[in-house]
Amino acid sequence: MAGRLLVLSNGHGEDLIALRVLQCLHQRHPELEIAVLPLVGEGSAYAPLEQAGALRRIGPRRSLPSGGFSNQSLRGLLADLWAGVLGLSWRQWRLVRRWGRSGDPVLAVGDLLPLLLAWASGAPYGFIGTPKSDYTWASGPGSAGVAALYHRCKGSEWDPWEWGLMARRRCRLVALRDRFTARGLRRHGVAALAPGNPMMDGLQADPLPAALEHQRRLLLLGGSRMPEALGNLRRLLGALEDWDPQAPLLLLAPCGSRPAPAEWEPLLRGLGFAPERIPDGTGAAAAWRRGPVQLLVGSGRFAAWAGWAELGLAAAGTATEQVAGLGIPALSLPGPGPQFK
């Protein structure tokens, strides 16, 4: 399977999902030349695979004030416009058009923006639709209200202009996150598949160390966008201050490259935590304690630690969905970040 592939993704969660797909694709077809254009942010999630020589990031990239959520608020949109989002999008569009002239395929991961750019390339394209599920309006707390009625009338969380792009002849693949959503799009003439949700791949928990077996275990998810992540973690930890646990409590705080350990220290010291020895077998980068509460911080430890948790306390996006997908209850505390606007 020689050739080239351009991958478009529009957000940190989408980058992680695309990364998981590309890891498997590279294992099966190491001769395939993979180029990645992150439409939102720097695409730092791709760095390990890029360093391994499996792909390369191309094109203009910039971290925007809204974090990719300019459609959630007028303030976010205006901030992105001031930061030059129109010029950035124009340069990205031109790059995709140049790629399309070669006839090499494009894979879009996300929602409307990468799907639209993939269609505009003029080349064959595929689409992995990550953010939308018909379960959000068909049942449960989200099944009432104007938005749910709108989706129910359409018969899909996806909008007509989106499924119109998915139904084009040049669109060779449409993969969605669940069978229920795929079935809704098939009624609109889209050959949608639901082969599985990539965000749930690779979440193989390490064995729980014996030293942690007798502690209650809570997973803290502050998100990956700075500086909101530190503020989110401060709120999550603050929400636990009045709780007097009847048993020793372990807080697991996996993170990415940010916040870095040095960025954690002033936050934790300000909340009365003191550093202590890291328990064996945890893979933590740092350990802190305040009375009966122990907190472990670990970069890149989400996949290993998520399965240890009895409860998730979250202000994150994709990671919150992954925890719920593992069957672990998750409480989401909306914060001031752009994803909650």
Question: For the regions a protein language model found, what residue spans apply to each?
Answer:
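Nucleotide-activated sugar donor-binding and catalytic core shared by glycosyltransferases
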Residues: 1-341
